[in-house]
Amino acid sequence: MAMLPVAQLYRRDVPALHTPEGADLLQVLWCPFDHQAMPRTTLFWRSAATVSDILNTPPEPPAMRSDGYLPEPCLLNPEQVTEYPDHLELSKERREQLGAWSEWQAAVTDVDDYASSPELFYDRELAAAPGWKVGGWPRWGATDPTPRLCPACGSDMDALLTIATFEGDDDRSWLPNEVREDREHTGPSSRHTGPEGQAVIDFFRAQGIEVHDRGRVPRDARVAPLGTNPAPRQPTAVQIGSGYDQQLYVCPAAPEHPHSELMH
């Protein structure tokens, strides 16, 4: 069975992409059938100068497990953002700081819905960004954090690429520009930090945690429901399981070592 193209990333476009020596291009392909509940991926590290005979339209497979395994072609517009690990990956001391709800109330307005679960506010509003991304942290929930060790040398593996079903959810601060622009009320630019956002930043800095505002959308840009067009939330038409992410990991010591993948 021929494998399908999933992503093609150039180092010139994605500075965070750590490639092996002599390579500046990553091509990700997968089998359009399940292997342990998700498509099996293959990585090709290449030199862009050696790529020729480019197909404008890749061939479609004669059969596949799901239509969600056939990505829609998309032109990437990458943006660098700062995100943080899920609360389950934090130290006990940091988790205790997150549980101090009175401090959250003093720093942020309109957050009473999270009073019983302060860590949920952190995970949704500040931690790992949803959507397709290079590097970054996983968004745990379906499973608890799992060790990611290189099968060849035992080194801790680094996140390479997240293949996501959705680019954003209705209840998260992280939104792609297309979704924000599709709202009935757009509000200020995502690069502007209002009083609420600055209060969150000040709160974390007081705990000795450096915080950046890039990638967050002010609350008044999130008041309207998502538009009727689902494409901004799912531009690639990819679906992993019932709406999960598939994250690929590589060995930082030797990217040519076998990679691993997790669904979460």
What residue spans do the PLM features occupy?
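Preference for intrinsically disordered or flexible, low-complexity segments
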Residues: M1-H264
